[in-house]
Amino acid sequence: MAVCKSFQVLYQFLLLFIFIGSVISSLKDVTSSVGLAGHDLGSLAAFGDFDADKKADLFFICNNVMNGKGKVDVYLWNSDRDEFEASSATITLDQVNITNVIPGDFDSDGHLDALVSYHNKTLLSYKDQTFVKVFFGKDSHFELNKVVELPDALKDQPAIVDFNGDLQPDILGDKASDGNRYWWKYNPQNNSYAKELVVSAVNILPLSIPQSSAFLDVSGDYIPDMVLTTKNASSNLIQYEVWINKDGVLTTNEKQIYSQPDSAAVIGQSTFADIDSDGRTDHILPVCVDKLCTKSEIHVHSSTSNKWRTILTNENSQGYKWSFIQDTVGYGIPLMTIRIGDYDMDGYPDAAMVVDITNNNAKDSKRKVVLLENVKCASGATCYNGRTFSMNIDSVFSSVEYPVIVGFFDIYDDGVLDIMAVSFDSAAETYKNHAIRNIIYSDTCFLKVIVLGGSCDNDCPGGIKPYGVNQAGPFVKYITTGLHGDTKVASATQLSQAAYFALQPPYIVFGLGRTPNFVEELIVGLPRSQTSPVRDHTWTSIIPNSQIIIIPFPPDDPGAWKSLLLITPSRLVMLTGGALLATCVFIAMLVGVLHW
């Protein structure tokens, strides 16, 4: 017993000695080298593995104001050349203004499809109605002869949820003609959508425009719930409806509804993340205290305390002042949007956003991309459960003039989150897309998780592996042990939001910091229906620096779910093995000396 304890102490000491230090990284503009420079692509709108090669691809929207055509183009990642290339997967619509594209497997055949929302420019007041078409993918193209249109016009862009827990994405929105809230389910028998009215015991308010509703677990039971962004027309206040999945049925009540922060005059798009890494999801909201956004703040709503807390304010900035931009530009892109990703890989989710920056010695402001590093804090007005944001203005973003979008994406599939940005030329009404590589110099660990759909495994139509289904809502949580013996927990939801250029990648990347230990537990939870059991499963002893693909088939038998582990070797793994080997040699020598 004493020898075992000595072995454990020595091993942990060697690991601490080897891996002590801070995370060092730099950013590099790689727009040209990945094939995105010099092309009039329109705006980056979504990610998805369209050709099912386990490499995520890019979806672009381009609206031509001259000929009235709207296009969606898919650029595929070429692993041999390390660049994105044009494909034959193209959607073209006449006399429309495309507002969004949402990749997903809408007919559950294992192929990635595309939901396209648009305004019909032939109609008077065309911006008051949003139309939806779903284009079904097959191999590396869209089946243009098998297009299904939503029979009803919506008031705004739809949200994607799994309302009935059948693991097939449903469409949620307010119908334009009567203003009521419905959800639409796809029927493969007649290739059509049928609607059902959303009913509740409480008064249902209209969804806000723009809306930022989400499909994710907020109750802590690993089953996805819904958080819907609504607006009270009489008070002009934003309210958030929380719909909890109880025995396979999504329900809400008055206690599950909360309002915007009292001090807020302007409300931005909601974002959700486990900010303090406690395994529970937090609601993150950019707000302006005044109508001009001269005082801007980021608030966090805790599901445990049911209160808003401030995590960042633009007061007391050193040498400059930042402020949110409340305008919506171009294709209807809300600028008050925060996108989440652990870019420094320390185990705490960071953020990126577009803001106006005014230097103290200048009168005019300049729009810039900024990064928000999630750092430790002891106390203070902007300290939320021991965490706060520290703003980072990197010079690499100087090439991104007049930015409108910024988000995180693993370009090179190496487990490190890079940065994608879009800038807008208002005079020419054209977009430029930018790729920024995130180079981590210190040996940090990661865990990349992709959860597939549960409709098929080896028997998918056409024999395809369902790697590109963009399953919305799976909840993922890990538990591991840090260098100091402390328990580390974090959680995230795959593709929790889709409307208004949410730009979420079709996977989850957890930074593990400089912790080379095995991930002790990985828990994955899926939506539940009324007739299904609880759908969650736990995997143990996951190797760090690996990508794990979860195949939840059959969905109602979690014990039979499969996992595919792809390891990304690094110096960290070798050093971990070296520490273990050195410990074993030391113990062997000690035993030998004592024996002789």
Regions found by a protein language model. Give the residues of each.
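Cleavable N-terminal signal peptides of Sec/SRP-targeted secreted and luminal proteins
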Residues: 6-25
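Beta-propeller blade repeat segments, especially FG-GAP/WD-type strand-to-loop junctions
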Residues: 21-30, 67-89, 122-146, 179-198, ...
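Repeat-based blade/solenoid architectures
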Residues: 33-46, 90-102, 147-159, 201-214, ...
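Acidic/hydrophobic-patterned starts of short beta strands in beta-sheet-rich repeat architectures
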Residues: 52-63, 108-118, 165-174, 220-229, ...
